[in-house]
Design a protein with these regions (language model features):
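Glycine-rich phosphate-binding loop signature in dinucleotide/nucleotide-binding domains
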Residues: 80-87
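Short amphipathic alpha-helical segments
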Residues: 49, 101-104, 126
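A short, flexible beta-alpha/helix-coil linker loop
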Residues: 9-12, 60-62, 120
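Membrane-proximal helix-turn-helix segments that form the acceptor-binding/catalytic region
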Residues: 106, 119, 133-141
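A short, charged, and often flexible helix/loop element on the N-terminal side
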Residues: 52-79, 127-133
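A short beta-to-alpha transition loop/helix N-cap that caps and shapes the active-site region
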Residues: 46, 120-124
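An aromatic- and histidine-rich active-site surface loop
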Residues: 89-121
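N-terminal subdomain of nucleotide-sugar transferases
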Residues: 1-56, 82
Length: 141
């Protein structure tokens, strides 16, 4: 089976999403499946890893996030899906990649979303941090 996992917010500092993807990839490969994961990067490039093929897509840094990136164009993701022809798609972001599920459904590609966060948790963590940074910046001017 060809499994494709797509995630924004994957990077050197990410913990849960990165760990989840690596554990999934390791398990799929042990069971004889092909595992590819698409993540944000500084450009387009591929690399083979012990946990599967990692494809980086051009991305932008999300302001006030501590360096997290999001894939710049979902069209690039859709084009890769068409090229890779996965049997199933796993999505690790229900916000910025939300259009991928309905798009895949129209093409009869099963898709599932992994929710690593709650909206209230995101607001509590990131909005508070962003506001604090903004206020501190403003006060230093």
């Amino acid at each position: 089976m060809r499994v494709l996992h797509i995630a924004n917010f994957y990077g050197d500092k990410s913990g849960g999403i990165r760990t989840t993807i690596h554990n999934l990839g390791h398990s799929y490969i042990q069971r004889g499946h092909e595992f590819t994961f698409i993540v944000p990067g500084t450009g387009f490039y591929c690399e083979e890893t012990p946990t599967g093929r990692m494809i980086h897509l051009p991305s932008i840094i999300l302001p006030f996030s501590g360096g997290y990136r999001i894939i710049r164009r979902n069209k690039d993701v859709r084009n890769l899906i068409t090229t890779l022809k996965p049997d199933v798609i796993e999505i690790s972001d229900r916000f910025t990649l939300s259009q991928i599920g309905p798009w895949a459904k129209k093409r009869n590609i099963p898709a599932v979303v992994f929710s690593h966060e709650t909206l209230s948790g995101l607001v509590k963590t990131h909005l508070k941090l962003s506001l604090t940074r903004f206020v501190n910046w403003h006060n230093r001017r």
